[in-house]
Amino acid sequence: MGGVERILVSACLLGRRVRYDGGAKTSDDDLLARWRAEGRLVPFCPEVEGGLPVPRPPAEIEGGAGGAAVLAGEARILTPDGADVTEAFLSGARQALAAARSSGVRIAILKEGSPSCGSLRIYDGTHRGRTTPGQGVTTALLELNGVRVFGEDRVPDAARYLETLT
């Protein structure tokens, strides 16, 4: 795109119905809308790209251990009935990294709280609606590879960071 920074964005934030419950979490952020109109956004849902259906059971990282522990093989991602969906989440994270690399992405805006995309907090692994500080698997992999990740509630911070890249 000739010097225009591309931004990886959770597809659910752009209105795509890819969430576990079959819904979207469409953002009404003006900056995201502007970047979308400029063609900067690279929509991506790691859970769907990893092979999980829509809708699907919710999943959480056991013990709220965080994405880095999953990447290291020290934690799993489980549904409330105990089904292990770790491999699908890892596959989606690897595909997100590949999409970021192929698009020249150095910044991402992802859905906070998600076991894939959370950047500051994730659910604690008890399936009781409680959160804990931590990152999702995709966020952890992207950050390990130099892509800076922001939650959807930190778009102004992402914009400031974006200015340092250009």
Placement of each model-derived feature along the sequence:
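Short catalytic/ligand-binding loop motif for oxyanion handling, primarily in non-cytosolic enzymes
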Residues: R17, L52-P53, S116-S119
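Short, surface-exposed acidic-centric catalytic microdomains
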Residues: K25-R76
